[in-house]
Amino acid sequence: MRLAAYCDAELFAGAERVLAEDVGMIGAVYVAHAPGKRDEVLGQLAKRRLALATQPSTRFIMYWETDANDVDFHIRDARGGHAWYSSKQLRSGGELYADITTGYGPECFAIRGKPTAAPYRLSINYYSQGPMGYGMGLLQIQKFDGQGNLSFEDRPYVIMTDQAFVDLGTYR
């Protein structure tokens, strides 16, 4: 399934990878709660060239409300690592998938397995203010245990000043 079949894919440049992982986790949650449907779920995933999520992960997914702004996600770990658009990986583990400069995102930083360098400090930078004058959106933290349990934490934000940083707290 290609996103371009449903919308202007350039406006959601980071979405296909994030959505593919979402589907794998949703499938795992479904199988955990309806084990008799496992073969059906696996078959539907295979038809779409998707995979059932089986490993723990923590994802930080940033969305925003207008396509004319450039909002960047920054994550710092307890070991002094800093991931952002110019340095997309932390030595402690984790990867920023893409730097989305046009469209609505999402920008996603994912840690495979269990996080090993907590606490993580989360912030955003209003890199380029668009004609709207403000950046508004959401950082969603998704924790998947690899066994079919998924939890969410939402951290909304509004950023008003070009080049400003907004602290979105820590994650343990």
Pin down the residues of each PLM region.
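Alpha-helical protein-protein interaction scaffolds
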Residues: 1-35
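Intrinsic-disorder/low-complexity signal
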Residues: 36-172
